[in-house]
Amino acid sequence: MDIASLAGILLALFMLVFGIISSAGVGGFREYLDPASAIITFGGAFSCTLTSVSLQNYIAGLKSFTLIFKAPTLNTSDMIGKIIELSNVARKEGLLSLEEAATDLDDPFLKKGILLIVDGTDPELVRAIMETELVSVEGRHKDTIGFWDTLAAMGPAWGMIGTLIGLVDMLYHMDDPSTLGPAMAVALITTLYGSLLANWICTPVSNKIKADNAIEMQQKEVMIEGLLSIQAGENPRVIEEKLKSFLPPKDRTSADEEGEAGGEA
């Protein structure tokens, strides 16, 4: 589990509750709970998001919320180490030996690439097939990101709509000045709900998925370059130096260690 994502959401919730209790007291917490405001804001935001995307992407977007808590199985340095290990196997035992090594791999993208080169597929065709799949994966990720970005935009918009509804009702009942304060407070709650939906949930989720997507795309590019280099019969050390160019300088030492471990296997 990615503890950082869970901690961020819970800390934000703590700050919110702390702020409310500090200003209004424990009993005043009820003042921030209004079912009608919640229905207008959340119902309107989710309904208009459904209008904006396909049903398939809507369902996939809702399900993707749990992905922010999933820790990556491998980082890019580990992936480079795995590819160097495979290159050593291919150099010692030949490309056909990679078919057996592929059975122990968990990543379907890497496994697919290995099976393509074991089958003797032309290198350009291997690249084309894998890059096409990479584009397809990135497209699905962008659809999910688009869902959360759309919902983030709809939340404050419907919060403002709810506030306007409350203000209209308040102005119609200005004959009783004692009701103006409470009516204004209720009207503003929808704006609060919309802002919370956008800035506490939707935008952080979207940003996390974008960050995870960038890491995954980099890893898949490393896989493509590494597998094509293995297919071309390049020296494992040359492959390692080539793939390390994907990493920032501070991470290249760990990649060296992974490569040395692979060479000793």
What are these regions (language model features)?
Residues 4, 8, 18-144, 216-265:
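Large intracellular
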Residues 7-10, 14-29, 135-212:
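Helix-termination/interfacial motifs at the ends of transmembrane alpha-helices
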